[in-house]
Structures are given as structure tokens and as C-alpha cells.
Amino acid sequence: MREILHIQGGQCGNQIGAKFWEVVCAEHGIDPTGRYTGDSDLQLERINVYYNEASCGRFVPRAVLMDLEPGTMDSLRSGPYGQTFRPDNFVFGQSGAGNNWAKGHYTEGAELIDSVLDVVRKEAENCDCLQGFQVCHSLGGGTGSGMGTLLISKIREEYPDRMMLTFSVFPSPKVSDTVVEPYNATLSVHQLVENADECMVLDNEALYDICFRTLKLTTPSFGDLNHLISATMSGVTCCLRFPGQLNSDLRKLAVNLIPFPRLHFFMVGFAPLTSRGSQQYRSLTVPELTQQMWDSKNMMCAADPRHGRYLTASAMFRGKMSTKEVDEQMLNVQNKNSSYFVEWIPNNVKSTVCDIPPTGLKMASTFIGNSTSIQEMFRRVSEQFTAMFRRKAFLHWYTGEGMDEMEFTEAESNMNDLVSEYQQYQDATADEEGDYEDEEEGEYQQEEEY
């Protein structure tokens, strides 16, 4: 019941996805051959959210893996949990997208998309009551961004009422892998605004900082970064997979976090993050978790929540703890930092409590915030986009795949609109009513005081 179908695309998406499955397998006591070796009934009670039980008693992840080149898939398959996945669910091309969004979205990706959709349909038919999809991808490359957004829009057409959650790795401000990242990211955001329900925004630089500053790793690898992401991903869905005192699912999350349909880009955080040697010197308490979780250094994307205001936020606590204490701590945060929350949404922090902590911890918490400061990410990408687009640099790679310049212009203005929407709600106060006519009409029917 309430299954989630996991889809990973491109090199980044597949590497994050692989780490995520390692974490989920460990939490549910599934060994690398797909057999259950755990010690608690709770691990099996709702294991079907992420796993399908095969006739021979093996548990098979509900995962679809796609890429336009075979490399990452091969290393996944030979990795620790490569044998748990259903072999038919690996869908890959041979050509690669060459960091070109147009190749992923219009040419190479479009050729492969039907075979991916076949696998998605097959998995969805296996579900009792599919709750939604979670997609892991990056926005800077070609496959995860171009083909990822193509798949999201196709799934949207076919399953319009299911939740669509994405874990999207944005290009980092200082660390760039590809010159054309701003193009790919802007074209992707243009799609995500329309077709995704909830986007968890991640970026490598913020993750590097956490590894470096907090976890004290001198040379963090992508494996370390992806481990951080997977901890968060597992935290977002723990309520679905384990019993809890205050449960939540993808839809409840969306209802509580999204005040306006386009503003669904969230920053995420995780606590406790401690360096490997120092765990045994701290006892974890709810106040400590809360404090670390709201700390701006803990956010997994390079936007500073102190530069904006929270429209809404959600906290998921895991472990044995008192719900009363959780509620008190959450109120405490809101009261002490009231200037960082918009006052026209009272009680805008939701908390959920799940009894089972992650492997190796007594308690932990996951934070998801809808903050107006996320516009910093979009603004930064947009500036880089404009600088190149003004000179039409690199455009021939995209127009050569049949794209039109118009599409770039549209994507650019959609992203700029998004930035100004965030800004408008950051500046809005409870008593002044401006012209919000671009929002759904009928939401504010009071006289304007401009």
C-alpha cells in the first residue's frame, strides 16, 4: 500500500540513487542479494513502499534506472547492491547526451523514452496503490536534466494525480563541471516549475562545505556527498515505511509546504551531522537536533535562509522521543526567530515523528523548508545564463538538435518570474494587500492599499 516508484537518471542521479538504496536496504535489513536478514517485524511491516516481494522471497527495489550511456550502469551493476535490482529495469542508450540538454530532451533521450516508460508502467501496475514517483537527477548535465524532465512530463501526462517528487542537484556557484550548466539548468527549471510537485534542491558546493566544515573530511568524495543526500532522502519517506506517532506522506508534505503552486522548491537539511570521531562525546537531545537542523550551515543547497523568510517548513524526527518536546522545540524556534517566518501564515512549521531511527543513530531529524531565499540559487544560474545567452555562446549545440532560440527566452523569463514571485512574498506583510493578480484569482479579495 502507498508505494513510491523511484527513478534515477544520468550519472549523478544513478550515483545518488545507488547510495540511497544502500541506506534503505540497511534500514529494512535487506542484504545485497535481496534477502531479508533483519531482526525486527517493523522492518517488514511496510517494506512494500520501496520493495516488491518476488516469488522466491527476495525483495526487489521498485526502481527504474536510466542513462544515455552504459558506463554508470555497469559500475552500478557491479557495485555492492547491483544484484538487488531487476535486470529489466536498467534502460540505457549507447550515445550519451554529451552534457547537452537538447540531446537528452529532444533527440537521444526521446528515442529511449518509450522503453523507459514501458518499465515505469510495468512497475506502476505492480503497485497496490501507487502514491507517487521520486526522481533523482542533476540539472547541469544532459541526461538527468534533459531526459529527466522529459520523463517527468510524460509521467505527468499518464499519472496526473500522483505526486511527483524530485531530488535535483543544481549547478554549484563556485564548482562547475560543465560550461553549459546554466543553459541546462534553466531549461530544466522551466520544466520542473510546471511538472513537478515538490523539488528538493541540492548542490554539490553546499554538500562539500558540510563535509569539510562539519564532518571534518579533508578530501570529500562524491560518495560522501551522496551519502548526505541519501540520509535526507530516507528521512523524507521514513514516515511511510515505519510506524510513527505523527505520520506524513508525500501529499501531506506538499499540502503543508506549498502555499502557491509554483513555489515548490525546498531546501533540505539533516541532523545530527558530526564528524566520524566525535559521535561518542555527545548525547543527542531534541533541542540539539532542532538547533542543528535549523542551522543555515546545515542546508544542502547554497542559499542562506537568513537572507529570506520561511513560507513554510517541515521537520521529521526519528527515534524514541516525546512528541510534546518536539512541538515545544518547534514553537520555540518560531518564536525566537519570528522575523524569519512570514507572519501571514501562522503556525507554518509542521512536525512528524517516526519511532524508528536511522541505522546507527539513536535519533535523527530531517528538515525541509520552503524559504524565499532559494531565489539566490535561481538568480545565480539566471545571471550566468544571461551572460552567455546575450552573446549566443554555445547555442549552436542546442539549435543543431532542433531547438529554437525562443525556447531559451521562455525558460529565462520563467525563471526570472519565479525569482520575483519569491521576492514578492518575502516582502509581503500580513496587513498590506498588493496586486497579486498573477496568482490564482480569488485568493485575496480585499481592497488594495497601494
From Swiss-Prot:
Question: Does the keyword field hold Transcription regulation?
Answer: no
Which Pfam families does this UniProt record tie to the protein?
Tubulin, Tubulin_C
Tell me yes or no: is Cell membrane among this UniProt entry's keywords.
Answer: no
Major localisation: cytoplasm
Q: Where does GTP bind?
A: Q11, E69, S138, G142, T143, G144, N204, N226
Q: Where in the cell is it found?
A: Cytoplasm, Cytoskeleton
Query: Which processes are annotated in GO (biological process)?
Result: microtubule-based process
- Could you tell me the keywords of this UniProt record? Cytoplasm, Cytoskeleton, GTP-binding, Magnesium, Metal-binding, Microtubule, Nucleotide-binding
Which residues hold Mg(2+)? E69
Description of how the protein assembles with itself and partners? Dimer of alpha and beta chains. A typical microtubule is a hollow water-filled tube with an outer diameter of 25 nm and an inner diameter of 15 nM. Alpha-beta heterodimers associate head-to-tail to form protofilaments running lengthwise along the microtubule wall with the beta-tubulin subunit facing the microtubule plus end conferring a structural polarity. Microtubules usually have 13 protofilaments but different protofilament numbers can be found in some organisms and specialized cells.
**Which PANTHER family does the record match to this protein?**
TUBULIN
Q: What else is known?
A: There are nine genes coding for beta-tubulin. The sequences coded by genes 2 and 3 are identical.
Family membership: Belongs to the tubulin family.
Reported function: Tubulin is the major constituent of microtubules, a cylinder consisting of laterally associated linear protofilaments composed of alpha- and beta-tubulin heterodimers. Microtubules grow by the addition of GTP-tubulin dimers to the microtubule end, where a stabilizing cap forms. Below the cap, tubulin dimers are in GDP-bound state, owing to GTPase activity of alpha-tubulin.
Entry protein name: Tubulin beta-2 chain
Q: Which organism is it from?
A: Arabidopsis thaliana
